[in-house]
């Protein structure tokens, strides 16, 4: 697909697998989505998303392969798409992202943006760029916001994954990952 770029040093396709997982959409309807992930992480990710689904406490707007967005991380984030594999470097570097190995998942990027100072990505995530705003939006009933004490963070951490919302120099609220190498 369009998210696999051998010229960038992507891992072999045989190290990746298509995973179908359950989730509740923003209207609360049960549905399924697709994530391309590392074979080595597939079982634990299936368990994590099943735990989140079973809690019925967290909602995801959409979950489609990044190929649908031409392999563009920006287009996928702007569509508030939850995704995993995308062979790309860490923004602003030449180092491959954990996404390039199928070892990272971004969930509801609009409600859970990347934030460094006044920079917010995607831009539509600006109403959710600070913890007080995030908590207020959740209190108003906005679905899909990842908070430290919530079901999504608990499920990922319980299964050995880390959360970008815990970082101190910047926040990546959408980002859950395993160490790549």
For each predicted feature, which ranges?
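Residues at structural and domain junctions
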Residues: 7, 31-34, 93, 142
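General secondary-structure edge motif
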Residues: 1, 28-32, 87, 136
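Active-site acidic/histidine clusters and adjacent loop/turn architecture
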Residues: 9-77
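N-terminal low-complexity, Pro/Thr/Ser-rich intrinsically disordered segments
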Residues: 1-11
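Residue-identity detector for threonine
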Residues: 20, 31-32, 50, 82, ...
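Sequence contexts marking disulfide-bonded cysteines in secreted/extracellular proteins
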Residues: 9-11, 86, 181
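Active-site-adjacent loop/helix surface patches within enzyme catalytic domains
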Residues: 59-101, 109-114
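Catalytic cores and adjacent binding grooves of peptidoglycan-active enzymes
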Residues: 89-181
């Amino acid at each position: 697909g369009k998210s696999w770029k051998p010229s960038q040093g992507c891992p072999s396709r045989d190290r990746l697998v298509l995973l179908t997982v359950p989730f509740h959409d923003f209207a609360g309807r049960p549905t399924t989505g697709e994530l391309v992930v590392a074979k080595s992480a597939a079982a634990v990710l299936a368990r994590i998303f099943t735990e989140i689904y079973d809690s019925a406490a967290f909602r995801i707007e959409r979950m489609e392969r990044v190929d649908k967005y031409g392999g563009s991380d920006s287009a996928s984030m702007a569509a508030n798409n939850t995704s995993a594999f995308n062979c790309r470097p860490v923004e602003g570097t030449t180092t491959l992202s954990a996404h390039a190995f199928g070892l990272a998942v971004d969930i509801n990027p609009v409600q859970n943006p990347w934030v460094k100072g006044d920079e917010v990505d995607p831009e539509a995530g600006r109403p959710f760029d600070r913890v007080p705003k995030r908590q207020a939006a959740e209190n108003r009933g906005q679905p899909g916001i990842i908070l430290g004490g919530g079901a999504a963070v608990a499920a990922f951490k319980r299964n050995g994954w880390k959360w970008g919302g815990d970082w101190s120099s910047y926040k990546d609220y959408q980002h859950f990952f395993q160490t790549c190498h």
